[in-house]
Design a protein with these regions (language model features):
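Oxyanion-binding "anion nests"
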Residues: 210-259
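Short, well-ordered beta-strand elements within core beta-sheets of diverse protein domains
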Residues: 87, 256-263
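A short beta-turn/strand-edge loop motif at beta-sheet boundaries
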Residues: 211, 266-267
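Short helix-capping and hinge/turn segments at secondary-structure transitions, especially at repeat
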Residues: 219-227, 263-266, 276, 280-284
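Conserved small/polar residues in nucleotide/adenosyl-binding loops
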Residues: 291-292
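N-terminal Rossmann-like NAD(P) cofactor-binding subdomain of oxidoreductases
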Residues: 1-206, 239-240, 268, 273, ...
Length: 292
């Protein structure tokens, strides 16, 4: 890519926004040019707006410290200088849906970390190794929004991203029953040990809302685009997922243990072979973050 894409971060002062900032530092493809947050933060430098709330394990990158934060509610102005937006905004779901659609209607693509649009039928919820063909639904979404370039795409819940690629690799063996336990870091709750000291040496065996997401979202990921309806139809085959989601005293990184029953017999050697040799359309793109 000869010229970097200019990107903005909506919700830049929060923990997910901070993670975007660290991930995009010195990125060969993207240049962060706009940091948007609440009206309370607008007009301040990023360092002033965040203050002592920087939660990353590495220092705040120099490139953002003196950038002036803009009001994320002013979608037209914020979007005018970017090629697309990363959304990490933290607000009620209906407000997230509304503001992300406002940005899309400025003809700005929105890539969202939020859950608000995950079940909007014409919004793709993508795990690149599994379902990049779901991007085809964007054509229908644009018709609904009245846009030619703007759209919304989302990522799924963080708890399913570790194990769903394995299910895709073993698709030929027809996974029928999945029993998964996830052990989720406190960063998933937007916390560090500094502001959640009760988690040191502690385990919480239930995370509100996570089990429903872990059981239902894979069905949309494994679904298909219905061109006639202009939406993604969740997988309705013989697949049952049961989950338990546990908060553990780890700062970053989730772990999942998965027990599977298949419709077709498979040997250990066959399962290993399919994992090792699994490829997808995403593999052809040579993405910087692709697993090697």
């Amino acid at each position: 890519m000869s010229e970097k894409l200019k990107v903005g971060i909506l919700g830049a002062t929060g923990m997910v926004g901070q993670r975007f900032i660290t991930l995009l530092e010195n990125h060969p493809w993207f240049e962060v040019v706009t940091l948007a947050a609440s009206a309370h933060s607008a007009g301040k430098t990023y360092a002033e707006a965040v203050g002592d709330r920087w939660k990353m394990e590495t220092p705040m990158p120099e490139y953002v410290k003196n950038m002036v934060v803009v009001d994320g509610d002013d979608a037209e102005s914020v979007a005018s200088g970017v090629d697309f937006m990363f959304s990490a905004v933290n607000m009620p779901k209906d407000q997230i849906r509304a503001i992300e659609e406002r940005y899309a209607k400025t003809e700005t693509p929105v890539v969202s970390n939020n859950s608000a649009h995950r079940w909007t039928p014409d919004v793709p919820m993508v795990v690149p190794e599994i379902n990049p063909e779901h991007f085809e639904v964007i054509e229908h979404q644009r018709k609904r929004l009245g846009t030619t370039r703007g759209f919304i795409a989302v990522k799924p819940n963080c708890s399913i991203q570790a194990y769903t690629p394995a299910l895709a690799a073993w698709k030929e063996f027809e996974p029928r029953e999945v029993v998964v336990s996830t052990y989720q870091a406190i960063s998933g709750a937007g916390k560090t040990f500094k502001d959640w000291p009760e988690m040191v040496g502690n385990i919480i065996p239930f995370i509100s809302g996570e089990e429903a997401k872990s059981e239902k979202e894979p069905l949309k990921v494994f679904g298909h685009v219905d061109a006639a309806k202009g939406e993604i139809v969740p997988f309705d085959g013989d697949l049952k997922i049961t989950s338990q989601c546990i908060r553990v005293p780890v700062l970053n990184g989730h772990t999942a243990t998965v027990f599977l029953n298949f419709g077709k017999k498979a040997t250990k050697e066959e399962l290993i072979d399919r994992l090792v040799n699994y490829t997808s359309k995403a593999s052809e793109l040579e993405l910087r973050s692709e697993e090697r």
